[in-house]
């Protein structure tokens, strides 16, 4: 039977999804299932790895059944995933020895402080491109080995395996035959040397993690093994894998140096491809691994904003200013400007490029004339201002002045926000027709790996832009508005 489709498994922080794409990169079918968030202690976040697998495997069955697609028609399955989340399981049984420790979990802060005391902060920064932070997988692994009974002894005997979620899914799909990750996920463990593209022995030693625990690192665009849907039907190749933000970068076809995308979700993630050069950031950004036009390793600068769409949720849930996120565009457009109002949404501190955990949210410039519309508009503008902060930091680090910014995520449906983003950055903003760019990136990698598509050039002909947003304010206005934002940020940090 002719291979007509590629399936992307998009395993996220709150839900597992499966999306079927046809040869023209159109979405044919989508299935999604949420799973349980576990908070056993303050600052701790866990998932049940078996529930993740159950949700992901069920949507895979469902998405094909819903569209009436037979496994014979599927060329490949690609994977994209929440990054950093850590699973350790028994090699012999496939049984997890503990819940998955989620990227948001802060329990390994003390381990990070111990590494800093050993003088490893600069080594981590130089060799992994990351900050020494509990966000990343390495200290989570150590916590499990130190705190789960018999775990360290089992690990020393080579009886345990570690994986981020991509690795766990491939292991389950291939029925325990394949233990593998890709460079984009390996680069988020804080154990991977991004220059030699190998596991870093010094960091493994510092954290007392046996090398036998770790998966083999294979290219993001390659075949890892085969699977059968629910154990039935024809074998399908499992091929193509990348962490969620790098998958979105590839899905937007940002495969050349200087190309960038911004994902507007709960927070914002801005990534710029820097080609074959790992650019060290002096402005609070991370250096990480991306995927090049032929599936090879490229590098990227990455910056994250904590409060993007979450700011709009705050307007709705805490202030009651709107009923639905989509209402913000209507109210923001009812006023010509914010009337001097700035909202700095530092509710959990400030992310890149400031990295100030002690900053707190504030509204500035309120007068008797300020109303709901001004505050809503200021909230939307804060998302664009924070993204400009990241973009300016990337320009300083890379020496590249961006001319076009590709965007994706839920908030890109807001035309007001996208136009203001173009205005305040003086950069053309491009919104794609298919905004499921994370899943699309996984599908592209899988399809290229098995020859379903021939090259990135072919994919470029399938990528359609829904709307171009052209900068529409002058330099003087732009400078005045941004100076007001910078002043507001400085005051939240005072």
Curated annotation (Swiss-Prot):
PROSITE patterns: FGGY_KINASES_1, FGGY_KINASES_2
Annotated InterPro entries: ATPase_NBD, Carb_kinase_FGGY, Carb_kinase_FGGY_CS, FGGY_C, FGGY_N, Glycerol_kin
Origin: domain of life: Bacteria
Gene3D superfamilies registered for this protein in UniProt: 3.30.420.40
Gene Ontology MF terms in the entry: ATP binding; glycerol kinase activity
Summary of activators and inhibitors of this protein: Inhibited by fructose 1,6-bisphosphate (FBP).
Single biological process term from Gene Ontology: glycerol catabolic process
Transferase found in the keyword field: yes
Coiled coil (UniProt feature): none
Binding locations of sn-glycerol 3-phosphate: 13, 83-84, 135, 244
GO cellular component terms, A-Z: cytosol
E.C. number(s) listed in UniProt: 2.7.1.30
Catalysed reaction, written as an equation: glycerol + ATP = sn-glycerol 3-phosphate + ADP + H(+)
Family, per entry: Belongs to the FGGY kinase family.
PANTHER family in UniProt: GLYCEROL KINASE, SUGAR KINASE
Protein known as: Glycerol kinase
Organism lineage: Bacteria, Pseudomonadati, Pseudomonadota, Gammaproteobacteria, Alteromonadales
């Amino acid at each position: 039977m002719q291979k007509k489709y590629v399936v992307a498994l998009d395993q996220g922080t709150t839900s597992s999804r499966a999306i079927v794409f046809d040869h023209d990169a159109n979405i044919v079918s989508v299935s999604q299932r949420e799973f349980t968030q576990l908070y056993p202690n303050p600052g701790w976040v866990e998932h049940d790895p078996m529930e993740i697998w159950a949700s992901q495997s069920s949507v895979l069955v469902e998405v094909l059944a819903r569209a009436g697609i037979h496994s014979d028609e599927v060329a490949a399955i690609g994977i994209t995933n929440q990054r950093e989340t850590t699973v350790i399981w028994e090699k012999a049984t496939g049984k997890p020895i503990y819940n998955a420790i989620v990227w948001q979990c802060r329990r390994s802060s003390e381990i990070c402080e111990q590494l800093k005391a050993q003088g490893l902060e600069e080594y981590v920064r130089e060799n992994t491109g990351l900050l020494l932070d509990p966000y990343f997988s390495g200290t989570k692994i150590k916590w499990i080995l130190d705190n789960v009974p018999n775990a360290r002894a089992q690990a020393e005997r080579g009886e345990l395996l570690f994986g981020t979620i991509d690795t766990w899914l491939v292991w389950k799909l291939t029925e325990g035959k394949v233990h593998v990750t890709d460079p984009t996920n390996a680069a988020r463990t804080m154990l991977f040397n991004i220059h030699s593209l190998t596991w870093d022995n010094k960091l493994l030693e510092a954290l007392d993690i046996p090398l036998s625990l770790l998966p083999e690192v294979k290219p993001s665009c390659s075949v890892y093994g085969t699977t059968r849907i629910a154990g039935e039907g024809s074998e399908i190749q499992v091929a193509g894998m990348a962490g969620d933000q790098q998958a979105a970068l590839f899905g937007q076809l940002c495969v050349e140096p200087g190309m960038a995308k911004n994902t507007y979700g709960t927070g914002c993630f801005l990534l710029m491809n820097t080609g074959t050069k790992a650019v060290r950031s002096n402005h609070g950004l991370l250096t990480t691994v991306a995927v090049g036009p032929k599936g090879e390793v490229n590098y990227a600068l990455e910056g994250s904003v904590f409060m993007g769409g979450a700011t709009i949720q705050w307007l709705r849930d805490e202030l009651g200013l709107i009923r639905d996120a989509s209402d913000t565009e209507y109210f923001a457009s009812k006023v010509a400007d914010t009337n001097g109002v700035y909202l700095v949404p530092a509710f959990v501190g400030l992310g890149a490029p400031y990295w100030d955990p002690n900053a707190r949210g504030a509204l500035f410039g309120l007068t008797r004339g300020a109303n709901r519309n001004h505050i809503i508009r200021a909230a939307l503008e804060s998302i664009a201002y924070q993204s400009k902060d990241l973009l300016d930091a990337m320009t300083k680090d890379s020496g590249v002045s961006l001319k076009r910014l590709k965007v994706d995520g839920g908030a890109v449906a807001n035309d007001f926000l996208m136009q203001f983003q173009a205005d305040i950055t003086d950069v053309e903003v491009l919104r794609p027709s298919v905004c499921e760019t994370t899943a699309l990136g996984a599908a592209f990698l899988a399809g290229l790996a098995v020859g379903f598509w021939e090259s990135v050039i072919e994919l470029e002909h399938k990528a359609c832009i829904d709307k171009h947003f052209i900068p529409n304010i002058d330099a003087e206005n732009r400078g005045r508005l941004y100076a007001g934002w910078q002043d507001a940020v400085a005051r939240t940090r005072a």
